[in-house]
């Protein structure tokens, strides 16, 4: 009997269970996410909206399988069972920008009970440019601004933007054999980043992107008007040349862009602080004690990124926030 109840768990079932609770007890809203990594992210979001009347419980879609991803959340017999007591939370990937071209895109964009990131994935939020300096401070305990992260990510986005439009265009055409997501990411990667001259790696990327653009524009000259129309459409959806990094594959932005610049910056900030400790120490024992204390206070930058919530100030996040507020308004 318990097994059948689990298999048939739905928004209506949870609603019925809520009604059996004492009047002052808070109602539970189950929020299914794609993987373990998503649990903390969505918990930090829903915590801002909970009150004395209800709370969210963030869960994986199955306790019998390690299956991950959007398909597991939406297609594992959950779609028809979602409602005011059960919601799904997914990374948008390209589905937000595909605007209903695929069945998954339609389901994500049209369902009132599916919350999407709008940014490609949670990693994009974790790499929100305006929060990167603070992340470095938390990781190194050094507030020296070595790099203008906002300017760097803006320039990166401006370079990637025209090729990004083509990448989504190929997805809409369902022609990934010619220009896949992997192909696109290979052109907008960063090579070794210099803390003193971070723009150099962007210049190398700019050269790769422009060469590929010339090739695509020549091969698909009939699509140029459609490409220009997509730029206008994307502007309406919130995608601009300045924030394109928020809509590029999240893992790529984290590993091949943000970490490429954050790692050398954090290393430099730590060395700077260590040199300061060495300079101010009156003797070797004090130096060793202070250095040990400092090292114990350090945090890996990738861990800091996963915990920071500076992205909540981003315009892209405001779209998700609006969806949650409208959902809560409907169920009250």
Residue ranges of each PLM-predicted region?
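Acidic, divalent-metal-binding catalytic cores of TOPRIM
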Residues: 1-332
């Amino acid at each position: 009997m318990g097994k059948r109840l689990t298999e048939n768990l739905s928004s209506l079932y949870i609603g019925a269970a809520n009604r059996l609770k004492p009047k002052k007890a808070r109602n539970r809203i189950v929020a299914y996410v794609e993987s373990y990594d998503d649990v903390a992210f969505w918990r930090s979001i829903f915590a801002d909206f909970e009150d004395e009347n209800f709370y969210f419980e963030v869960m994986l879609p199955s306790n019998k399988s390690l299956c991950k991803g959007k398909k597991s959340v939406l297609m594992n017999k959950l779609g028809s069972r979602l409602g005011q007591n059960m919601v799904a939370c997914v990374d948008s990937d390209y589905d937000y920008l595909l605007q209903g071209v695929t069945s998954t895109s339609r389901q994500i964009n049209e369902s009132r009970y599916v919350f999407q990131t709008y940014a490609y994935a949670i990693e994009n939020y974790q790499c929100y440019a305006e929060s990167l300096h603070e992340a470095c401070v938390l990781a190194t305990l050094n507030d020296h601004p070595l790099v203008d992260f906002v300017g760097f990510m803006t320039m990166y986005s401006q370079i990637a933007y025209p090729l990004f439009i083509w990448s989504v265009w190929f997805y809409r055409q369902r022609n990934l054999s010619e220009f896949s997501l992997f192909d696109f990411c290979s052109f907008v990667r960063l090579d070794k980043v210099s803390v003193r001259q971070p723009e150099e790696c962007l210049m190398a990327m700019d050269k790769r992107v422009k060469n590929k653009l010339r090739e695509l524009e020549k091969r698909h000259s009939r699509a140029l008007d459609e490409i220009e129309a997509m730029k206008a459409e994307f502007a309406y959806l919130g995608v601009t040349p300045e924030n394109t990094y928020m809509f590029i594959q999240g893992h790529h932005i984290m590993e091949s862009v943000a970490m490429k610049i954050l790692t050398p910056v954090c290393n430099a900030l730590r060395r700077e602080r260590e040199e300061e400790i060495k300079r101010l120490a009156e003797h070797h024992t004090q130096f060793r004690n202070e250095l040990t204390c400092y090292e114990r206070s350090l945090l890996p930058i990738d861990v800091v990124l996963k915990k920071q919530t500076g992205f909540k100030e981003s315009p892209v996040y405001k779209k998700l926030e609006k969806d949650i507020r409208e959902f809560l308004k409907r169920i009250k």
